[in-house]
Structure formats: C-alpha cells, structure tokens
Amino acid sequence: SFLLTASPPSTMFHQICNAEHPLLTLILCGLLPLIASIFIGPRLIAILRALKAGQPVRQASKCCNAPEHQKKAGTPTMGGLMLIGLVIIGTLLFCDLSSPAVQCCLLVTCVTAFLGFLDDYAKITRHSSDGVSGRFKIIIQAIAALAVGCYLYYGAEGYGSLHIPFCGDIELGLFYIPFVMLVIIGSSNAVNLTDGLDGLASGCMIIAALAFCALPAIVGTPELSPFLLLIVSACLGFLLFNCYPAKVFMGDTGSLALGGALGTVAVCMRQEVLLVIIGGVFVAEAVSVMVQVFWFKYTRRRYGEGRRFFRMAPIHHHFEKGGWSETQVCVRFWIAALALAILGCGIASQDLYNTAL
C-alpha cells in the first residue's frame, strides 16, 4: 500500500521552518488558516448560495424547536470545504510528511472529508436530510481506519497496545487493528452527531484539539502539534461564520473529517483513553443516540410501543426540548468541553510524572 511504501520527503516549508525555526512553524499554523478564513469565508458563502447548496433540515414536526430550526433551511452547507481544505494545505506545507503519525492523520482526514462531501452533495441534490447510506459511510471509514491500524501495527514502532493512565500498557496483539478502527470510526461519527447546533461542533473541536496540542510535549509526539494547531486555527476561522446565527454549516464534509482526524491523533499519540475524557462531549452525543435507539427498541418489544429515554437525541436536542436556547446549549457544552480538556491534560501530566518516578 501507499502508506507502507511511501516515505515522502519533508517539504520545503518544513525544512526551512520546522527544522530551523520550529516556533515559526507553530505560529504560522496557528495564524494562517484563521487569516485565510476571514478572506475566503465570505466568498465561499456567496458561491454556495449561488449554487443553491442549502442545508436541508428535518421536518418541522420532528424538530425540537421547529420554528427556529426551519429558519435554517437553505443556509449554505459544505463550509467544511474551506475548513478541511485549509487543514490539508497547511499539513502539506508545514508538517513533517515523513512522520507515520502525520501520514495517518492526513489519510483519514482526506478520506473522511471526501466521504462527507459525497454525503452533503447527495443531500443537496435530493433536497433531503438523508444523504448516502449509513452502511456506505461505515465501509469507507472502516477502509481508512483499517489502513491506519495495519500501518501502525506492522510498519511503525511502539504500537500494538492500549495505554491506560496510571495502570500501564495492555498488549492487544492483532486485536489492536479492530481497536484502532473502532476509535477512528467512533470519533468521526461522534463529531458528526455533535454538529447539530450553530457553533457547537466547531467550538468543542477547538477545545479538544488545543488539549491534544498540549499533549505532544507530554507524550512525545511533537510532529502532531502543527497539525493540531492547523485544526484549531481553521475551526476558529470557520466559527466566525458558524456562530449563531450561522451563515454557513460545515456539513459532513467538515464534521466527519474533524472527528476522523481527532480519533487518528489519539491513536497515534497512544492516548485513546484520554480521547474519551477530552472528547467527552462528543462521546456523550454518540452515547445518547445509542441509548435512545436501544431503549426505543427494547420498550417496543416489551410494552408494544417504543418509548424514548431522552426527549430527543442527540443529547443537545434533549436540552433544547427542556427549554434551553440554542446559544445556552452551545456555551454550556463548550464549558463542559473545557472542563474535560483540563481534566484530560491533568491526567496525562500526572501519568507522565508517575511513570518517571
């Protein structure tokens, strides 16, 4: 495969900046996507409007706040083209492409972004909130995640185990590959489920990526810091147009790719357990959907009618139905994400300290 055989040389920008001036690389990664978004964003929104690439929404009867959500019908989607495009371009320019971790992150980001694009395109052309089939999504995500799992297990050193803070490593053997697939696929879809309110997914992603950006200094994967800063900067730029009331949505093009990238970063850092903590908001969103589906099917078999565990899933809609405004849900979820990120970084630091003793 390409990943097993290719060893792309470091880019010119990496040789100039990262090798001799690593701080300059981090500054550029942290600023350029944000600045570029300010100039590209309005033009992209205008193009998407001209192409009538509007976001289909659920039927009014199914919406937790029908009048408010119906106003969003027609808001341009596929804003992830700008967000993920800037991340990919920045990765090619500033990141060390000879690093297996960077290669894996770039692969998953590109594949899931393309998958998200196909899904968004299907929704727009069909004028429906249903895109490509869920089975097709899982298959494509599984192929990309399988490539990463095999590459790390067979072609890179130091992989094949699960690191549990304060407890050490558990060797997984060949089970490491399906474990990697579970992490990446789960993360990709969890972020996708979170992208249901203006600014919610992008804001939580900024916090999670910043937390993981602090971890390379702790766990020894500094080559991922520029990649994570690119995500933070691009999400900040996108949030300028995605905050309430949103002028553009990232669509599955952005959310599937961001989630896939975050999951791959956690795998490459060997911090899958911390992903559950730092990405706790994403986990809660995904778990709420699984609980809702399970409970509905269980009660339908037992009582003859399906009952809901939450007012509505994903869980951000549960709070909307409980009377929280959209901005209240977003800000409070951001606060929860920040608290979990601080907790995760604290656990990582203490784990390193205990290991060094």
Q: What positions do the PLM features span?
A:
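Extended accessory regions or peripheral subdomains of proteins
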Residues: 143-144
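Interfacial loop/helix-cap signal at membrane boundaries in integral membrane proteins
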Residues: 3-14, 18-19, 67-68, 73, ...
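A cross-family signal for N-terminal binding/gating loops and helix N-caps
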Residues: 49, 54, 70, 82
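Alpha-helical transmembrane segments
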Residues: 1-49, 85-114, 148, 152-155, ...
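Membrane interface segments of multi-pass transport proteins and intramembrane proteases
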Residues: 123-133, 164-170, 300-302
